[in-house]
Amino acid sequence: MIQQETYLNVADNSGAKKLLCIRVLGGSNRRYGSVGDVIIATVKDATPNMAVKKSDVVRAVIVRTRKSIRRESGMSIRFDDNAAVLINQDGNPRGTRVFGPVARELRDKNFTKIVSLAPEVL
């Protein structure tokens, strides 16, 4: 459950380390985002000499949340952190690697490139 002012870790090698959520996309009055939702965020911490700099405004897709996700089968899944992967306007990841597990719900939302780069899909 990600909302405005939520801090997220970055799960790729684009150069950003921490993000601050500015907006959850998908409706004028949308309050919360979950796995697979696109957010607008600002970079709060970044690696030097990379493409993404501190204070850049970026798009990202949420890949892990601390809030548990209910599945159709009745199972629920929860992660240890809130994390996102930076994407461009086309929905493709800006980095070339994805770190840590990602949720299977990303495949349903057509983020197949992120799913294929991830080391583990839960």
Swiss-Prot record:
PROSITE patterns the record matches: RIBOSOMAL_L14 (PS00049)
SUPFAM superfamilies: Ribosomal protein L14
Cellular compartments per GO CC: cytosolic large ribosomal subunit
GO MF terms, alphabetically ordered: large ribosomal subunit rRNA binding; structural constituent of ribosome
Keywords, comma-separated and alphabetical: Ribonucleoprotein, Ribosomal protein, RNA-binding, rRNA-binding
Gene Ontology process terms (BP): translation
Gene3D superfamilies: Ribosomal protein L14
Pfam name, any one: Ribosomal_L14
InterPro entries tied to this protein: Ribosomal_uL14 (IPR000218), Ribosomal_uL14_bac-type (IPR005745), Ribosomal_uL14_CS (IPR019972), Ribosomal_uL14_sf (IPR036853)
UniProt KW RNA-binding keyword: yes
SMART domains, alphabetized: Ribosomal_L14
Family indicated by similarity: Belongs to the universal ribosomal protein uL14 family.
Quaternary data: Part of the 50S ribosomal subunit. Forms a cluster with proteins L3 and L19. In the 70S ribosome, L14 and L19 interact and together make contacts with the 16S rRNA in bridges B5 and B8.
Family annotation (PANTHER family): 50S/60S RIBOSOMAL PROTEIN L14/L23, LARGE RIBOSOMAL SUBUNIT PROTEIN UL14M
Task performed by this protein: Binds to 23S rRNA. Forms part of two intersubunit bridges in the 70S ribosome.
Protein's name according to its UniProt entry: Large ribosomal subunit protein uL14
Organism listed in the record: Thermosynechococcus vestitus (strain NIES-2133 / IAM M-273 / BP-1)
